Design a protein with these regions (language model features):
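Long, low-complexity, intrinsically disordered terminal regions
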Residues: 2-808
Length: 808
């Protein structure tokens, strides 16, 4: 870190009042705080803090797109395919008959600034309000109606001040109202806390049942994701198994290793680069923090205000948590806590973290690249369908058997169904694959046609005459084996591959970059680089040079992949296919019955590093068989809408389609990925109109049929197939469009692949705009067809989405 950067860090640290996480930043006297605590002692309430950071879960509640599509108003379900009986990780929420949630506004005279004091004064009146109540500082929720619409209560503070509290009924909320849905989630988070589960990020974990992997210095906390929403058939809780990986070494250990590796001079710069942006866990309060900066001039001996006195960080942790800090010279970490300050104001200042007490969460890139670590982790985290279902059932049973949890639910007249939801899905038939002049079927249960395609010529592939292969001296044998095997496998595939010019480089990044600069010219069609390891920085440097500085198709392969002779034919075949694709080859196709159709895929990548820009990506099909694609990436500023940069890209794609086909597409179907919770409003209200503007720019009389589909891959929904007493993953092609879909959306799930281990993840498709009039059956079938067109694997996958993710 430069001297200027250190000065900025010092300025940020000094410019705001700082405190240890969990320390009370007093805005009033200690006697006043004590009075509040005494008044509120013994009262249980659902706190606003239990709602903190959760409101975005419900922002998509108000997006009602289905009502605008006449052809799916009555029914959005398909009928084709073979019915299949499934269970899903959903549990119905049950409530007593005529259940209503009563909402009250609470007013204090004189006004009380402290929300905590307001709660304490209000909850003095338990006889009037009852034991079950939820108060967020302004609104009071009760499971029963008070005798009068306006109830006036009187309280006295500890210092004798009289306070009048007016409680006014403002709303009677039915179980399906958005406020009630949010309220159910608040109550359930209360239940999870009763079960001694700890919130980390958006999920809850059980620190009392850790899974230790000592050989890798890792610990796994098992936990669950939970969301309660209104679905097609009922209000249900969707819950799935989650795992949080914690490292056994502290941030101080990592800093010591960095100092040893890079020396004192470069340590500040390297340390900041490695640590800033990472998430840490402080076990003394089980909270997570993002490292935003490093306070190079702060140590545990520095002090901060606690009440009216100054206390050092070292003494604070000793008195508050009984923790001894061994290294008094370690610098502190800065985390800009997002929580609001008193009365909704800005936070008083950043949290200062002691590295010795912080544990990194998640995995580093180096860990992810370590096969042994990932294999050992997967034995605990990659659950088979039967194990996952068993864990979910055990979770709900635990809630039902815990007396405190049941008492909390009983107070509100709520309960959960004891069993997973049963529903009926449909399995679409497998597709015929067309390759060259041949066609073939595949096993629909495995969704893999790598065997069937062997020995068959591809649809189209340009000859590869001028190409380079780079390798180190140590990897000479592996590189030669790859060249020879590529020659063997290319003939049957109809590929014409000449021998490459082989370039040897020293095994370090600078040497490889120089070798690329000296040898890659405009006449080179392809560059293959054999890497000695899967270090991300080396791979990134190759791709950056060959994508940005000297655009040339490239293929990287790790030498270890080539070291097993028995697998070399398979590996070489896959490499040959990828090389062909990158030069514009077409491998196989499926039957697409819709004519003059353009498929568009849109995604956005957000770099979480401070100050970095987002990247928007668009791909668009150019031919009937969906085997040729237009692609464009654009850099965007943070916060900029994705379509601002991609409007011109879509216009360019339409012009390319016109050149390729001598006509414009009569139908356009856009698959939009990368839409997070709470962002659906933006897609519906902004992006759709931007897409339409791009289309109009071609000509005012050009009005193709348009469909926009939001795709979500990272979802919690899981489905299980029971057969002869055994639990399996649903087969590829399974469609679910009832029960667990949302009533206000035209949405469906597709299981589009088979997995060898663990539980399969379905993909959620939400049609947010549609003038095509396609029946649900046709929309689902077309989407499944496109899943066959991802050329990186000879298996079914989410084609358009994966091409955007890979940047092909």
């Amino acid at each position: 870190m430069t001297g200027r950067a250190r000065a900025r860090a010092r300025g940020r640290a000094r410019g705001q009042e700082t405190a240890a996480p969990g320390a009370v930043r007093a805005a009033f006297t200690s006697c006043f705080v004590l009075a509040v605590l005494q008044i509120s002692a013994g009262f249980q309430q659902v706190k606003l803090g239990e709602r903190g950071g959760r409101r975005r879960d419900f922002h998509d509640e108000g997006v009602n797109t289905r009502q605008l599509m006449e052809h799916v108003k009555e029914s959005k379900s398909g009928t084709t395919g073979t019915p299949i009986q499934l269970t899903a990780n959903f549990f119905r929420i049950l409530s007593r008959p005529q259940w209503v949630l009563y909402q009250y506004h609470v007013d204090f005279k004189p006004p009380m600034e402290s929300r905590r004091l307001r709660s304490a004064l209000l909850f003095q009146h338990e006889e009037t309000l009852g034991a079950a109540r939820s108060y967020d500082g302004a609104m009071l929720f009760l499971p029963h109606r008070l005798h009068n619409k306006v109830t006036v209560l009187h309280s006295v503070t500890r210092n004798g001040e009289k306070v009048q509290i007016t409680v006014t009924l403002t709303n009677e909320l039915p179980p399906t109202s958005p406020v009630c849905i949010q309220f159910y989630n608040i109550i359930f988070r209360r239940i999870l806390r009763i079960l001694n589960m700890q919130q980390i990020g958006r999920n809850y974990y059980n620190p009392g049942d850790p899974l230790n992997i000592p050989q890798h210095k890792l610990t796994i906390w098992p936990g669950f994701t939970t969301t309660i929403l209104k679905y097609e058939s009922a209000i249900m809780m969707c819950t799935d198994v989650s795992h949080r990986v914690l490292r056994s070494e502290t941030v101080l250990d990592i800093m010591a290793n960095l100092r040893q590796q890079c020396g004192i001079q470069r340590f500040p710069e390297i340390c900041a680069k490695e640590l800033i942006g990472l998430i840490v866990l402080t076990k003394y309060n089980n909270k997570t923090y993002k490292i935003d900066d490093i306070a190079w001039d702060h140590t545990p001996n520095n002090t901060f205000k606690r009440g009216d006195t100054d206390i050092s960080f070292r003494n604070y942790y000793k008195t508050q948590y009984g923790l001894d800090i061994s290294d008094g010279n370690q610098v502190l970490l800065i985390s800009h806590v997002k929580k609001m300050g008193p009365s909704g104001g800005p936070p008083p200042g950043p949290a200062m973290l002691v590295p010795e007490l912080c544990y990194l969460t998640g995995l580093s890139d180096k860990m992810r690249a370590d096969y042994r670590i990932m294999k050992d982790l997967s034995t605990h985290t990659r659950l088979t369908p039967d194990k996952r279902e068993e864990r979910l059932n055990r979770f709900v049973t635990h809630i039902q058997k815990d007396s405190d949890a049941q008492a909390e639910l009983d107070k509100w007249g709520l309960s959960f169904d004891e069993q997973l939801l049963h529903l009926t899905g449909r399995v679409l038939r497998g597709e015929t694959i067309f390759q060259g002049s041949k066609s073939y079927e595949y096993n629909p249960m495995t969704a893999d046609w790598s065997r069937e395609m062997r020995g068959l010529a591809l649809m189209q592939s340009p000859p590869l005459n001028n190409w380079l292969m780079f390798h180190t001296r140590r990897n000479h044998n592996e590189a030669q084996s790859l060249v020879q095997t590529l020659s063997r496998v290319s003939g049957p595939l109809g590929l014409r591959i000449q021998r490459p010019v082989v370039v040897e480089y020293d095994d370090h990044q600078e040497s490889l970059l120089r070798a690329l600069q000296h040898n890659v010219g405009p006449q080179i069609q392809m560059v293959v680089v054999v890497l000695s390891s899967n270090r991300k920085d080396k791979y990134d440097s190759v791709k950056k040079y060959l994508c940005v500085d000297c655009p040339t198709p490239s293929q990287c392969v790790v030498s270890r992949t080539l070291s097993r002779p028995q697998a070399l034919m398979t590996v070489a075949t896959k490499i040959a296919l990828q090389m062909s694709c990158k030069m514009g080859g077409e491998l196989w196709s499926v039957d697409i019955p819709l004519k003059q159709l353009m498929i568009v895929g849109i995604d956005c990548y957000h770099d979480t590093t401070a100050g970095k820009r987002s990247i928007g990506a668009l791909v668009a099909s150019l031919n009937q068989s969906m085997s040729r694609w237009f692609s464009k990436c654009v850099l965007q500023h943070r916060g900029q809408e994705i379509m601002d940069g991609l409007k011109m890209a879509l216009t360019a794609a339409l012009k390319d389609y016109l050149k390729f086909n001598n006509c414009l597409p009569s139908r356009i179907i856009v698959y939009r990925d990368g839409v997070g919770d709470g962002q659906l409003h933006s897609v519906v209200n902004y992006e759709v109109s931007q897409i339409m503007d791009s289309i109009k720019s071609i000509g005012q009389d050009y009005v193709p049929k348009l469909t926009v589909v939001v795709v979500k891959k990272r979802i919690s929904a899981r489905f299980f197939y029971h057969k002869n007493g055994t639990v399996f993953n649903p087969p590829p092609g399974t469609v679910i469009d009832t029960d667990v879909t949302r009533p206000e959306w035209y949405d469906f799930y597709i299981v589009s692949q088979a997995v060898q281990t663990g539980s399969v993840s379905p993909t959620h498709y939400n049609v947010v705009y549609d003038t095509s009039g396609l029946k649900p059956d046709h929309m689902q079938r077309l989407t499944y067809k496109l899943c066959h067109m991802y050329y990186n694997w000879q298996v079914i996958h989410i084609n358009v989405v994966m091409y955007r993710d890979k940047g092909h």
